[in-house]
Amino acid sequence: MKKTPSRLFPTYEVGSLPKLPARTSALEGREVADDEMQQLKRLGLKYGVDSAGAEEVIARLQKEKRKPASEERKQLLDFNALLNLRIQEKSGIDFVYDGEARRSEMYRHVVQQVEGFEDLPEMIRSQEEQSYRKSVCVAEPKLKLGALSVLVEEEFAFAENNALHKVKVPLNDPYMIAVMSDNRHYTRIARKQFPEDVWKQEYQAKREFTLALAKDIIRPQVEAVVALGASWIQLDLPCATVNVEHLPIVVEGVNAVVEGIPASFSLHFCYPRRNSLTKKNGYELLYPHVLHLDQRVRHFSLELANADDYESDLAVFAQYNTERKFDLGIGVIDITLGRHREGLYEKPQLVRERILRAAEVLKDPSLVYVAPDCGLRQLKLDRCIRLYEIMVEGAELARRG
């Protein structure tokens, strides 16, 4: 029996945690530094995760100067995943996952398992220190044989079987993959359909690409985890407002993923700083489009601690609550690298104030969930742990009033 979540202001993680350095070094065939091994042992002991197996694998790999075989790799990933679960649970987080311990990177993790994609040689800088290798869609995308096991089945089964708290599964959104890829295949088709209209070419190509990804790449992953027992699935939409003219495509893509599936869905949005000509800004950009989301989409996870105007951004959702209510996971922890480099942390009291302000603006405390702004993979693990603790402490203070 998994722990029952808090009834007021439940907490959750958004998705990623940084990979354990010892695990990463071992997987890549590099020497594991003494401080990396000490961290592995220290965290294993602190969070009650037996590190003996992982230590034995690493010692053997170091002695033989090689990369791990399949079973050795699995041992290291299992240890990292279980450690991430226990870190979240012992920090007091209500809904947990494995910190995406088995995923190399949110984009590459998926496209490497898709036929119809070819890699570009250069790395693309996305934001701050993050970069990724872009792929080109050259044919209709289809999952490779065995892809579901690699992408989600093994990962979810391990998390579900080992988690002591309720599980929320983060997955990619199809539009995100479409934006981050070179859309050569569908652009070629659209140019033939609309030879004189560049805007229609771009729109139709993006729409067809997104829907193909939704139906043939993302939806099968959702169906797989639901078949294994998943009840709450989060789709990550960091690129949702890159082009506000494409918001109908975003909504159509999400609906193609979730339609008819017996689960509850949430969407994670990064803060929508305006990238197209419009009088709207912030989360106002999402409306009225999100009103047309499938009814299975009941929850939004929002980057807010790093937003332009905390109350104004929340007021948008209150304004539309008469038409459709969404539960809101409010970002109360700013995870930007600038704060990380300066060693800055929110105070639990500030987290409390943000939560209570959200409850006041929305006029319904039951709509408010509590989360970091985004996934934490770009930070140091010790900092992530402290941020979780601050978030949970602030939520408890808010429950007291």
Please identify what each model-predicted range represents.
Residues 1-401:
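Domain-level signal for soluble alpha/beta catalytic cores
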